[in-house]
Amino acid sequence: MNIELITQLASLILIVASGPIVIGLLSLKQGNL
């Protein structure tokens, strides 16, 4: 396994996972659930 591939996969996973988390936190702060 190349270190570059691992870092790219990790960054993609972080970006994909951070999307719903940020939306959830914003909705919790606004109380629009």
UniProtKB/Swiss-Prot annotation:
Name of the protein described by the UniProt record: Photosystem II reaction center protein Psb30
Record organism: Lepocinclis buetschlii
Subunit: PSII is composed of 1 copy each of membrane proteins PsbA, PsbB, PsbC, PsbD, PsbE, PsbF, PsbH, PsbI, PsbJ, PsbK, PsbL, PsbM, PsbT, PsbX, PsbY, PsbZ, Psb30/Ycf12, peripheral proteins of the oxygen-evolving complex and a large number of cofactors. It forms dimeric complexes.
Family to which this protein belongs: Belongs to the Psb30/Ycf12 family.
Location of the protein in the cell: Plastid, Chloroplast thylakoid membrane
InterPro entries found in the cross-reference section: PSII_Ycf12_core-subunit
Membrane topology listed for this record: Single-pass membrane protein
General function of this protein: A core subunit of photosystem II (PSII), probably helps stabilize the reaction center.
Biological processes annotated in GO: photosynthesis
Ranges that cross the membrane: 5-25
GO cellular component: chloroplast thylakoid membrane; photosystem II
Keywords assigned by UniProt, alphabetized: Chloroplast, Membrane, Photosynthesis, Photosystem II, Plastid, Thylakoid, Transmembrane, Transmembrane helix
Pfam families linked: PSII_Ycf12
